Amino acid sequence: MEERYRMIHYLCYCCAIFFALICLLLATRLSAQAQTREAYVAQSEDETTLTFYYDALRATRTGTTWGIEETKKEGDIPVPAWAETWDVADYTTTARVVFDASFRDFRPTTTAKWFYCCEALKQIEGLEYLNTSEVKDMSYMFYDCKALTSLDLKNFNTKNVTDMNSMFAKCGALKSLDLMNFNTQNVTDMSSMFDDCWALTSLDLKNFNTQNVTDMRKMFSDCRTLTSLDLKNFNTQNVTDMSNMFFSCGRLTSLDLQHFNTQNVTNMDGMFFSCEALTSLDLQHFNTQNVTNMEGMFSYCKALTSLDLKNFNTQNVTDMSWMFFDCWTLTSLDLKNFNTENVTNMSLMFSGCSALTSLDLKNFDTQYVTDMREMFSYCAALTTINCNTTWWCPESENMFAGCTQLKGAVAYDKNKVDAEMANPETGYFTAQPTMGESR
């Protein structure tokens, strides 16, 4: 009996040892496998599909594979090795992207340019397996994905992202974007974020936290079918660049920017350029004390009938060229408070303002202006330009071309349209001394 117990005990011991060895082998194997896992992208043999993996099976994949950090050059700019470029020889036909379930265990810190110039891309599957919790850079992520019509980004964790520059730029077929879950509290760059998103008719950005954003240039540029934008919750206190922000938003009929804090903005070049449907703009709260560039700011705002710029501080502006170009329906402009002492360029400033009948520029200081080319050209209804007695004008061609109704000291002569006629003694200006000059 004792012998039998001894045998049973021995067998139990052997089983325990065997089980322990099996567990050790499995653990070793799993550990080894875990240690060799890598994030990579595999291209299908027909070059139409990219699949993102995080496993130890890269060597078994057919077709080309790239490590997740591999790059190539687009000119001098590094882009992911699998991304497409403008080089025709490098052009591929990626129509589909798949995130394998294994990829959910990977934590990228950047997704910048991941789908750069994938012009044929129509479908992205498994985005729920892309964990973006540690991503800081999403710039150019979907840049020029012009065949994409929709994107499901509800699982995107963007709490650590600082750069969204050009994230959706040139996604010309995107008809809608649900960004309600986007946490943008740390984003500093939103420049060109929706640039050239021609098909977007609406954008709900009420949840956007823009408190740290410094760059909004071209943010909505060429969003040609946007009919409205609610930006009342935008905090723009740190923004320095708003150039071309609403460039060619041709169907926007109104913009409520009363809450915009522009105290740190230095560049408003082309800010409302070609907003052809805007009928009014309330900019009374705009602080422009640090702005240096207003080139083309209201160019082609063809439906604007009036602009209240009394509160504009232009003391640091150097460029006012094209500022009101082709504002066809503007009937008046009160620029009495404009400080132009640092302006060097006024070319085409009022060109094409065919409804303006008079301009009072007696407070304009033009001592540093070097270019007045076509400054008043084709202001067909303009009859009077008031100036001060110190107006100075460099040689500038076609300054008064097409101003057929203009009369100052002399009546308009189509053969005399250059800078020599920019005076109140023998030209088309009417002298109206400033208070300082009349004392």
Language-model regions, residue ranges each:
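Intrinsic-disorder-associated, low-complexity terminal segments enriched in Asp/Asn/His/Tyr and depleted
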Residues: 10-13, 244
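N-terminal secretory signal peptides that target proteins for export/translocation
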Residues: 1-10
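Negatively charged
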Residues: 33-439
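Bacterial N-terminal signal peptides
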Residues: 14-28
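Conserved short loop/turn motifs at secondary-structure junctions
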Residues: 9, 22, 29-33, 387-389
